[in-house]
From Swiss-Prot:
Residue numbers on the Cytoplasmic membrane side: 1-19, 85-102, 287-351
Membrane topology: Multi-pass membrane protein
Record carries keyword Transmembrane: yes
Ranges where the record places region Disordered: 329-351
Regions crossing the membrane: 20-44, 65-84, 103-125, 264-286
This protein's name: Rod outer segment membrane protein 1
PROSITE patterns assigned to the protein according to its UniProt record, in alphabetical order: RDS_ROM1
Taxonomic lineage: Eukaryota, Metazoa, Chordata, Craniata, Vertebrata
Any Pfam family matching the protein: Tetraspanin
UniProt entry keywords in alphabetical sequence: Cell adhesion, Cell projection, Disulfide bond, Membrane, Sensory transduction, Transmembrane, Transmembrane helix, Vision
Function of the molecule: Plays a role in rod outer segment (ROS) morphogenesis. May play a role with PRPH2 in the maintenance of the structure of ROS curved disks. Plays a role in the organization of the ROS and maintenance of ROS disk diameter. Involved in the maintenance of the retina outer nuclear layer.
Side Lumenal, residues: 45-64, 126-263
Length: 351
Protein backbone atom coordinates (compact mmCIF):
# COMPACT_ATOMS: atom_id res chain seq x y z
CA UNK A 1 0.00 0.00 0.00
CA UNK A 2 1.35 3.42 -0.94
CA UNK A 3 1.40 5.89 1.97
CA UNK A 4 -0.81 8.98 1.86
CA UNK A 5 0.97 12.33 1.38
CA UNK A 6 4.53 11.05 1.86
CA UNK A 7 7.33 13.57 2.50
CA UNK A 8 11.04 12.78 2.37
CA UNK A 9 12.72 14.18 5.49
CA UNK A 10 16.53 14.38 5.68
CA UNK A 11 18.27 15.24 8.95
CA UNK A 12 17.95 19.05 8.95
CA UNK A 13 14.29 19.13 7.87
CA UNK A 14 13.50 16.60 10.62
CA UNK A 15 15.09 18.85 13.22
CA UNK A 16 13.30 21.92 11.88
CA UNK A 17 10.02 19.97 11.88
CA UNK A 18 10.48 19.08 15.55
CA UNK A 19 11.38 22.67 16.47
CA UNK A 20 8.48 24.12 14.48
CA UNK A 21 6.03 21.65 16.00
CA UNK A 22 7.30 22.55 19.48
CA UNK A 23 6.67 26.27 18.81
CA UNK A 24 3.23 25.67 17.31
CA UNK A 25 2.32 23.42 20.26
CA UNK A 26 2.98 26.22 22.72
CA UNK A 27 0.95 28.60 20.57
CA UNK A 28 -1.86 26.02 20.59
CA UNK A 29 -1.65 25.76 24.38
CA UNK A 30 -1.88 29.56 24.59
CA UNK A 31 -4.86 29.63 22.23
CA UNK A 32 -6.52 26.87 24.25
CA UNK A 33 -6.03 28.88 27.43
CA UNK A 34 -7.55 31.98 25.79
CA UNK A 35 -10.49 29.85 24.64
CA UNK A 36 -11.03 28.71 28.22
CA UNK A 37 -10.94 32.29 29.50
CA UNK A 38 -13.30 33.69 26.84
CA UNK A 39 -15.78 30.83 27.11
CA UNK A 40 -15.69 31.04 30.91
CA UNK A 41 -16.34 34.79 30.76
CA UNK A 42 -19.27 34.28 28.39
CA UNK A 43 -20.67 31.56 30.67
CA UNK A 44 -20.52 33.93 33.65
CA UNK A 45 -22.28 36.64 31.64
CA UNK A 46 -25.02 34.21 30.64
CA UNK A 47 -25.36 33.06 34.24
CA UNK A 48 -26.06 36.65 35.28
CA UNK A 49 -28.39 37.25 32.32
CA UNK A 50 -30.08 33.84 32.42
CA UNK A 51 -33.30 35.40 33.74
CA UNK A 52 -33.68 37.36 30.52
CA UNK A 53 -33.13 34.41 28.17
CA UNK A 54 -35.96 32.10 27.19
CA UNK A 55 -35.49 28.50 28.44
CA UNK A 56 -35.65 27.28 24.84
CA UNK A 57 -32.70 29.46 23.77
CA UNK A 58 -29.73 27.27 22.81
CA UNK A 59 -27.13 30.05 22.94
CA UNK A 60 -25.51 28.74 26.19
CA UNK A 61 -24.38 25.66 24.22
CA UNK A 62 -21.70 27.82 22.56
CA UNK A 63 -19.58 28.59 25.66
CA UNK A 64 -20.08 25.07 27.01
CA UNK A 65 -18.76 23.52 23.80
CA UNK A 66 -15.95 26.07 23.57
CA UNK A 67 -14.94 25.33 27.16
CA UNK A 68 -14.50 21.63 26.38
CA UNK A 69 -12.71 22.41 23.10
CA UNK A 70 -10.33 24.79 24.87
CA UNK A 71 -9.47 22.16 27.47
CA UNK A 72 -8.67 19.56 24.78
CA UNK A 73 -6.64 22.10 22.78
CA UNK A 74 -4.67 23.05 25.88
CA UNK A 75 -3.89 19.40 26.61
CA UNK A 76 -2.95 18.73 22.98
CA UNK A 77 -0.63 21.73 22.95
CA UNK A 78 1.14 20.74 26.15
CA UNK A 79 1.43 17.12 25.03
CA UNK A 80 2.68 18.13 21.59
CA UNK A 81 5.29 20.45 23.09
CA UNK A 82 6.60 17.66 25.32
CA UNK A 83 6.66 15.07 22.53
CA UNK A 84 8.35 17.31 19.96
CA UNK A 85 10.98 18.42 22.47
CA UNK A 86 11.65 14.82 23.53
CA UNK A 87 12.04 13.78 19.89
CA UNK A 88 15.25 15.83 19.69
CA UNK A 89 16.85 13.56 22.29
CA UNK A 90 17.08 9.83 21.63
CA UNK A 91 17.18 9.12 25.38
CA UNK A 92 13.96 11.05 26.14
CA UNK A 93 11.86 9.99 23.16
CA UNK A 94 11.12 6.29 23.94
CA UNK A 95 8.56 7.04 26.72
CA UNK A 96 6.68 9.31 24.30
CA UNK A 97 6.38 6.71 21.54
CA UNK A 98 3.42 5.08 23.25
CA UNK A 99 1.81 8.44 24.04
CA UNK A 100 1.85 9.94 20.56
CA UNK A 101 -0.76 7.68 18.98
CA UNK A 102 -3.44 8.24 21.69
CA UNK A 103 -2.58 11.96 21.65
CA UNK A 104 -3.12 12.12 17.90
CA UNK A 105 -6.38 10.18 18.10
CA UNK A 106 -7.82 12.31 20.92
CA UNK A 107 -6.57 15.54 19.37
CA UNK A 108 -8.12 14.68 16.02
CA UNK A 109 -11.43 13.20 17.15
CA UNK A 110 -12.22 15.17 20.31
CA UNK A 111 -10.22 18.35 19.75
CA UNK A 112 -10.94 18.77 16.06
CA UNK A 113 -14.57 17.78 16.45
CA UNK A 114 -15.25 20.12 19.38
CA UNK A 115 -13.43 23.04 17.77
CA UNK A 116 -15.34 22.59 14.51
CA UNK A 117 -18.63 22.28 16.39
CA UNK A 118 -17.85 25.34 18.50
CA UNK A 119 -16.95 27.38 15.43
CA UNK A 120 -20.19 26.34 13.76
CA UNK A 121 -22.19 27.30 16.86
CA UNK A 122 -20.44 30.68 17.00
CA UNK A 123 -21.66 31.35 13.47
CA UNK A 124 -25.19 29.95 13.82
CA UNK A 125 -26.39 30.49 17.40
CA UNK A 126 -26.30 34.33 17.56
CA UNK A 127 -29.35 34.24 15.27
CA UNK A 128 -31.36 32.43 17.97
CA UNK A 129 -30.21 34.98 20.54
CA UNK A 130 -32.68 37.59 19.22
CA UNK A 131 -35.72 35.42 19.83
CA UNK A 132 -34.42 34.16 23.17
CA UNK A 133 -33.91 37.68 24.53
CA UNK A 134 -37.21 38.84 23.03
CA UNK A 135 -39.17 36.24 24.97
CA UNK A 136 -37.06 36.51 28.12
CA UNK A 137 -37.30 40.30 28.40
CA UNK A 138 -41.04 40.23 27.71
CA UNK A 139 -41.50 37.77 30.58
CA UNK A 140 -39.25 39.88 32.83
CA UNK A 141 -41.35 42.99 32.21
CA UNK A 142 -44.58 41.07 32.84
CA UNK A 143 -43.32 39.71 36.20
CA UNK A 144 -41.80 42.99 37.38
CA UNK A 145 -44.76 43.60 39.69
CA UNK A 146 -44.80 40.07 41.16
CA UNK A 147 -42.59 40.81 44.16
CA UNK A 148 -44.60 38.46 46.39
CA UNK A 149 -45.21 35.65 43.89
CA UNK A 150 -43.03 32.56 44.48
CA UNK A 151 -40.55 32.14 41.65
CA UNK A 152 -40.68 35.80 40.62
CA UNK A 153 -39.74 37.58 43.84
CA UNK A 154 -36.43 38.76 42.39
CA UNK A 155 -37.80 39.85 39.01
CA UNK A 156 -38.06 43.52 39.99
CA UNK A 157 -34.57 43.69 41.47
CA UNK A 158 -32.97 41.91 38.51
CA UNK A 159 -34.73 44.12 35.96
CA UNK A 160 -33.73 47.28 37.83
CA UNK A 161 -30.12 46.11 38.02
CA UNK A 162 -30.15 45.30 34.31
CA UNK A 163 -31.42 48.74 33.30
CA UNK A 164 -29.03 50.55 35.62
CA UNK A 165 -26.00 48.50 34.61
CA UNK A 166 -26.53 48.46 30.84
CA UNK A 167 -28.14 51.92 30.58
CA UNK A 168 -31.27 50.65 28.86
CA UNK A 169 -35.01 50.93 29.37
CA UNK A 170 -37.70 48.43 28.48
CA UNK A 171 -37.38 45.80 25.81
CA UNK A 172 -37.04 48.05 22.75
CA UNK A 173 -37.58 51.41 24.44
CA UNK A 174 -39.21 53.15 27.38
CA UNK A 175 -42.70 52.86 25.85
CA UNK A 176 -42.65 49.09 26.44
CA UNK A 177 -43.48 49.83 30.07
CA UNK A 178 -46.75 51.43 28.97
CA UNK A 179 -48.12 48.03 27.88
CA UNK A 180 -47.48 46.09 31.12
CA UNK A 181 -48.55 46.55 34.71
CA UNK A 182 -45.30 47.18 36.55
CA UNK A 183 -46.81 48.59 39.76
CA UNK A 184 -47.61 45.91 42.33
CA UNK A 185 -51.29 45.56 43.19
CA UNK A 186 -50.54 45.97 46.90
CA UNK A 187 -49.60 49.59 46.24
CA UNK A 188 -52.88 50.36 44.47
CA UNK A 189 -55.74 51.92 46.39
CA UNK A 190 -58.95 50.06 45.47
CA UNK A 191 -60.97 53.07 46.65
CA UNK A 192 -59.26 55.42 44.22
CA UNK A 193 -61.58 56.07 41.30
CA UNK A 194 -58.69 56.63 38.88
CA UNK A 195 -57.27 53.20 39.76
CA UNK A 196 -60.66 51.56 39.33
CA UNK A 197 -61.24 53.26 35.98
CA UNK A 198 -57.85 52.21 34.63
CA UNK A 199 -58.34 48.59 35.67
CA UNK A 200 -61.87 48.42 34.27
CA UNK A 201 -60.83 50.02 30.98
CA UNK A 202 -58.31 47.23 30.35
CA UNK A 203 -59.50 43.92 28.90
CA UNK A 204 -57.06 41.91 31.04
CA UNK A 205 -57.80 43.93 34.17
CA UNK A 206 -54.31 45.44 34.38
CA UNK A 207 -53.35 48.79 35.80
CA UNK A 208 -51.54 50.46 32.90
CA UNK A 209 -49.92 53.89 33.11
CA UNK A 210 -47.72 55.95 30.82
CA UNK A 211 -44.78 55.82 33.24
CA UNK A 212 -41.54 53.93 33.78
CA UNK A 213 -39.61 52.61 36.81
CA UNK A 214 -36.92 54.80 38.33
CA UNK A 215 -34.21 52.49 36.98
CA UNK A 216 -34.96 53.91 33.52
CA UNK A 217 -33.81 57.35 34.62
CA UNK A 218 -30.50 58.69 33.41
CA UNK A 219 -28.59 59.96 36.48
CA UNK A 220 -26.49 62.20 34.22
CA UNK A 221 -29.53 64.13 33.05
CA UNK A 222 -29.34 67.88 33.81
CA UNK A 223 -32.97 67.94 34.93
CA UNK A 224 -35.09 65.90 37.39
CA UNK A 225 -36.23 62.54 36.11
CA UNK A 226 -39.81 62.45 34.86
CA UNK A 227 -41.37 59.02 35.28
CA UNK A 228 -45.12 59.48 34.87
CA UNK A 229 -47.49 60.94 32.27
CA UNK A 230 -44.80 60.71 29.63
CA UNK A 231 -47.31 60.59 26.76
CA UNK A 232 -49.03 63.83 27.85
CA UNK A 233 -47.23 66.81 26.26
CA UNK A 234 -48.95 69.24 28.65
CA UNK A 235 -48.07 67.43 31.89
CA UNK A 236 -44.40 68.43 31.79
CA UNK A 237 -43.78 71.64 29.83
CA UNK A 238 -40.00 71.16 29.94
CA UNK A 239 -40.17 67.56 28.71
CA UNK A 240 -40.12 66.85 24.98
CA UNK A 241 -41.49 63.35 24.26
CA UNK A 242 -39.57 63.41 20.98
CA UNK A 243 -36.28 63.57 22.92
CA UNK A 244 -36.72 61.25 25.93
CA UNK A 245 -33.00 60.54 26.10
CA UNK A 246 -32.57 63.78 28.06
CA UNK A 247 -34.21 62.03 31.01
CA UNK A 248 -34.46 58.32 30.19
CA UNK A 249 -32.15 55.74 28.69
CA UNK A 250 -32.70 55.85 24.95
CA UNK A 251 -31.86 52.25 24.03
CA UNK A 252 -33.92 49.18 24.78
CA UNK A 253 -32.34 46.33 26.72
CA UNK A 254 -32.84 43.91 23.81
CA UNK A 255 -30.58 45.93 21.53
CA UNK A 256 -27.95 46.44 24.22
CA UNK A 257 -27.82 42.78 25.29
CA UNK A 258 -27.74 41.47 21.72
CA UNK A 259 -24.81 43.74 20.90
CA UNK A 260 -23.00 42.78 24.11
CA UNK A 261 -23.44 39.01 23.77
CA UNK A 262 -22.82 38.94 20.02
CA UNK A 263 -19.59 40.86 20.58
CA UNK A 264 -18.45 38.23 23.08
CA UNK A 265 -19.49 35.36 20.80
CA UNK A 266 -17.71 36.99 17.84
CA UNK A 267 -14.49 37.25 19.84
CA UNK A 268 -14.86 33.65 20.97
CA UNK A 269 -15.50 32.52 17.39
CA UNK A 270 -12.32 34.23 16.17
CA UNK A 271 -10.27 32.54 18.89
CA UNK A 272 -11.86 29.18 18.03
CA UNK A 273 -10.90 29.62 14.36
CA UNK A 274 -7.26 30.37 15.25
CA UNK A 275 -7.21 27.47 17.71
CA UNK A 276 -8.59 25.09 15.08
CA UNK A 277 -5.90 26.15 12.59
CA UNK A 278 -3.15 25.63 15.17
CA UNK A 279 -4.65 22.28 16.17
CA UNK A 280 -4.50 21.05 12.57
CA UNK A 281 -0.90 22.23 12.12
CA UNK A 282 0.27 20.66 15.39
CA UNK A 283 -1.41 17.33 14.66
CA UNK A 284 0.10 17.24 11.17
CA UNK A 285 3.55 18.07 12.54
CA UNK A 286 3.31 15.41 15.23
CA UNK A 287 2.10 12.78 12.77
CA UNK A 288 4.90 13.41 10.26
CA UNK A 289 7.43 13.53 13.09
CA UNK A 290 6.12 10.25 14.51
CA UNK A 291 6.21 8.35 11.21
CA UNK A 292 9.61 9.76 10.28
CA UNK A 293 11.15 8.69 13.58
CA UNK A 294 9.57 5.25 13.41
CA UNK A 295 11.55 4.66 10.23
CA UNK A 296 14.76 5.52 12.12
CA UNK A 297 14.01 3.56 15.27
CA UNK A 298 13.18 6.69 17.25
CA UNK A 299 16.52 8.45 16.64
CA UNK A 300 16.05 11.84 14.98
CA UNK A 301 19.72 12.33 14.09
CA UNK A 302 20.01 8.94 12.46
CA UNK A 303 21.84 8.85 9.19
CA UNK A 304 20.10 8.88 5.86
CA UNK A 305 16.71 10.01 4.72
CA UNK A 306 13.41 8.82 6.06
CA UNK A 307 9.85 9.23 4.95
CA UNK A 308 7.04 10.82 6.90
CA UNK A 309 3.45 10.25 5.88
CA UNK A 310 -0.07 10.95 6.99
CA UNK A 311 -1.48 7.43 6.65
CA UNK A 312 0.30 4.17 5.78
CA UNK A 313 -2.15 3.62 2.93
CA UNK A 314 -5.38 4.83 1.40
CA UNK A 315 -8.54 4.77 3.47
CA UNK A 316 -9.91 1.92 1.38
CA UNK A 317 -6.76 -0.13 1.89
CA UNK A 318 -6.71 0.57 5.63
CA UNK A 319 -10.34 -0.49 6.05
CA UNK A 320 -9.77 -3.58 3.92
CA UNK A 321 -6.72 -4.58 5.94
CA UNK A 322 -8.57 -4.01 9.21
CA UNK A 323 -11.48 -6.10 7.93
CA UNK A 324 -9.21 -8.94 6.89
CA UNK A 325 -7.32 -8.86 10.18
CA UNK A 326 -10.58 -8.85 12.08
CA UNK A 327 -11.85 -11.77 10.02
CA UNK A 328 -8.71 -13.79 10.64
CA UNK A 329 -8.85 -13.01 14.34
CA UNK A 330 -12.39 -14.40 14.60
CA UNK A 331 -11.78 -17.40 12.32
CA UNK A 332 -11.60 -20.60 14.39
CA UNK A 333 -8.35 -22.51 14.27
CA UNK A 334 -8.47 -25.89 12.48
CA UNK A 335 -8.99 -28.79 14.82
CA UNK A 336 -6.04 -31.10 15.21
CA UNK A 337 -6.58 -34.73 14.25
CA UNK A 338 -6.53 -37.03 17.26
CA UNK A 339 -3.37 -39.18 17.44
CA UNK A 340 -3.64 -42.81 16.39
CA UNK A 341 -4.31 -45.02 19.34
CA UNK A 342 -1.67 -47.68 19.99
CA UNK A 343 -2.95 -51.24 19.85
CA UNK A 344 -3.23 -53.02 23.17
CA UNK A 345 -0.13 -54.79 24.41
CA UNK A 346 -1.96 -58.14 24.53
CA UNK A 347 -2.61 -57.97 20.78
CA UNK A 348 1.05 -57.23 20.12
CA UNK A 349 2.11 -60.19 22.29
CA UNK A 350 -0.16 -62.67 20.47
CA UNK A 351 1.19 -61.46 17.14
Amino acid sequence: MAPVLPVVLPLQPRIRLAQGTWLLSWLLALAGGLTLLCSGHLLVQLWHLGTFLAPSCSFPALPQTALAAGAVALGTGLGGAGASRASLDAAQYPPWRGVLTPLLVVGTAAGGGLLTLGLGLALALPVSLHQGLEEGLQAALAHYKDTEVPGHCQAKRLMDELQLRYHCCGRHGYKDWFGVQWVSSRYLDPNDQDVVDRIQSNVEGLYLIDGVPFSCCNPHSPRPCLQSQLSDPYAHPLFDPRQPNLNLWAQGCHEVLVGHLQGLSGTLGSILAVTLLLQVLVLLGLRYLQTALEGLGGVIDGEGETQGYLLPGGLKDILQTAWLQGGLAHKPAPEEAPPDEEPPKEVLAEA
